[in-house]
Amino acid sequence: VGRESTPPARLDDAVVMSLTPDRVDVVLRSKVDAAWHLHELTRDLDVSAFVMFSSMAGLVGSSGQANYAAANSFLDALAAHRRAHGLPAISLGWGLWDQASAMTGGLDAADLARLGREGVLALSTAEALELFDTAMIVDEPFLAPARIDLTALRAHAVAVPPMFST
């Protein structure tokens, strides 16, 4: 085994008060259980990389996606845990991609315009692949490959998260 990566995520968007344990579990299981099992199965193997696809939602939150944000935060923490134990790991907190997918298929033009006004810009596939290649040579447990318009983010945020300040 040379490299390991986690399976795709599941979504079940809702406001926090309407999330049931079952709804949270479905979303957590797709990322948390899969990543933890891969961690356990590979921690004694000589793998060259352990790559997890997280989301900016774990870093900055996302309206209606508390369960998804929690699942992604777990991946980010698992990468730090593995690195603290001398194991390879990186969690990539991806921003928005412009290519339609199961994750973005429900976004319409109005949603994309709102995200843009809030500072979240879509990555082209070429940009995302270039950022992925770069991430594979950077020695960090977590990176956030994303296009962010800091001016727009500052204009719509009560406080800019420290990660995005100068």
Regions found by a protein language model. Name each.
Residues V1-T166:
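4′-phosphopantetheine-dependent carrier domains
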